[in-house]
Amino acid sequence: GATAKPEDGELFEQFARDYKDYKNITFWHKNLIGIEWQKALLSVDAIMMPYAAERYRYHWGAMLFTAIGFYKPVLASPELNPEVLQQFNIGKAVDLTSIPAFTKQLEEFIDDLVQNTEVYQKNLDAANEAYSQENLIKNILR
């Protein structure tokens, strides 16, 4: 992903270095726009959003709703719209306290996705309904 501040870019690059030996994890530190963005979203099974700073609690929430709109389960920072993961079983709050903790969580998350595909699909359907354009318009017109 793209980063807004130099310290975020440094943290992103550190994550990429820490996980460089995992060939099935890819980090893209660039802006993805238009069709390139859509193709990237369609090419993955799940989306990880490791926004670690408190300032991102709602600032970058759009990425979470994009993941929901593309029916993608998520590993999201606990700071990122936490009420969404509390209401819908569409992913987990990511634990980046250490490489072993994250590795264990990632393995468990993948196993859970495989074993509970229908649960994730049902919850992604419900989240899409709750955050639909139709419901947005209805709430605006009230």
Set out the residue ranges of the language-model regions.
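Short beta-strand segments
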Residues: G1-A2
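Nucleotide-activated donor-binding/catalytic signature segment of Leloir-type glycosyltransferases, i.e.
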Residues: G9-Q38, S43
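Conserved beta-strand scaffold positions in the cores of enzyme catalytic domains, especially
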Residues: F27, V74, G91-A93
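CheY-like receiver
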Residues: A40-S43, Q105-F109
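A short alpha->beta transition loop at the rim of the catalytic pocket in nucleotide-sugar-dependent
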Residues: D45, Y71-P73
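Nucleotide-sugar-dependent
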Residues: M49-F65, S77-E79, E83-V84
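A charged, aromatic-enriched C-terminal amphipathic alpha-helix characteristic of glycosyltransferases
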Residues: T97-K104, D111-R142
